[in-house]
Amino acid sequence: AQQLTFPDAQGWGRFATGARQGGAVYHVTNLNDSGSGSLRDAISQPNRFIVFDVAGVINIKDRLVFKNNLYIAGQTAPGEGITVYGNGVSFSGADNIIVRHMRFRMGHKGSSGKDAAGIANGQNMIFDHCSFSWGLDETFSINPDNKGKHPDYITISNCIMGQGLMPHSAGGLMQSDYISLYRNLYIDNATRNNKIKGINQYVNNIVYNWKNGCYIMGGDSKGDSFVNIEGNLFINGPANGGNAFSGGAGEGAFNFYGEDNWQDSNMDGKFEPKEVTNYAAGVRQSIRYDYPEMPKWAGNTLLENLLPIVGASLPYRDYCDCYMVDEVNSLGKQGELLANEENLPYGTPDKWRVWGGNKKIDSDGDGMPDAWEKANGTNPNKDDALVIAANGYANIENYINSISVADHDYFLRMPMCVEFVSSTSSCIKLKWRDYTYAEDGFCVEITKKDEILWKEVARTAANSTSCTIEGLEPGVAYMGRVRAFADAGKYSEYSPELTMATRP
């Protein structure tokens, strides 16, 4: 049997080989926009496994353009992982690409009229557990330009495509063939979640908060479509976008097999989906097309099965993904169509305080940590990353495939977006966003505004997002701050200090 890209790779892109056929390991050693050790330099040449010795935000001015035969392994980063911000990325012309656990966040200062991520030509690619946001045209599109190879045999799986920027705000235009869209979250895109043409499978996706277009049946071009649409969940949000399915403007028959698709249109904070019966357009088939088999969850179970793991979840989700997942969990009550990412409450990535973590010891510099090599029978003192193991993967692929949530550096993230809510003469209520992992709770400290002695006044349980401080003096100005704690005596950094006051 043909070797899968990684053991649970699915869909038409599942045989991409990246740099397995011969290449080199490239270490990203800094967060610079360009130059030696940068991500831009790493992707400028073909035939590379790209690993990360650093964590943080890479601020880019120009778009990143990827070469052939690359494997970008974001889960190898220490700390809180890698976020790319400032412009979009292009995989056009790049064959045989593997991208995992990366975040690409374009932003309103990016190249005008461009996607956050796009493919116009090139084949055999898989994007798994990645996050894409803030595109100025689409968030992630595969749209042929009739140059080079037709963009076919591509999988986008376990990814988040979110917050396409207004006025366009579109999830994706999918007008190619042999495209698998599997277990993704499309959120806060006004339209095109996706707009689909050609040979396509759309399985186990969640779409949340669209306005004038959710799943659009048929693209903008000529040609017939043959599509499986199975086990998806559509949840209306504040943009109140109506039915999940609508017809497209393109010419040609839209032939589809639709089964087990659900929509919750109540926008009331309760999960009450109904199975879709109105597909609006197209020619419905009674037998599914014989496309690549893939495991399926029931469409009405995706909140519990997909939402906890979707996006670039290793080593930790970033603030943007945490924010979007919280919106989905509100079940219709939260969500917005965004014009400028600078308006988000947690700030833009270039201002984030990202924990860098600790690079694992790798004596021979082959991209595989010594501890893993010793445990798995490879040589920590010899560059053996590209040696093909008995299971058909290169040694470095076996290392990458082994990385799980249990391998990340232990880290308590501080509570985000701490806000004053209300007060009485003796109480003050605060709220915050809980983007922290594995905390046992949060502790709240205050001091009078003209004093410097901080005092802990409350402790909350894990996963809490608010606290009422009691027993305060009337008519007094206070400063407040919050941090996460774990019972092992570990603490996060403090949140920024907040000014507040009791009523007289």
For each predicted feature, which ranges?
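Right-handed parallel beta-helix
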Residues: 69-74, 78, 95-106, 123-137, ...
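Pro/Thr/Ser/Gly-rich low-complexity, intrinsically disordered linker/stalk tracts
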Residues: 409-438, 474, 491-504
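Extracellular beta-strand-rich solenoid/capping regions of secreted or surface-exposed proteins
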Residues: 40-46, 57-73, 82-100, 106-123
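Acidic Gly/Asp/Thr-rich repetitive segments characteristic of extracellular carbohydrate-active
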Residues: 4-50
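Extracellular calcium-associated, cysteine-rich motifs in secreted modular proteins
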Residues: 344-411
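Extracellular beta-rich repeat passengers
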Residues: 196-344
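Beta-strand-rich modules
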Residues: 469-488
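Extracellular low-complexity, O-glycosylation-prone stalks/linkers
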Residues: 434-459
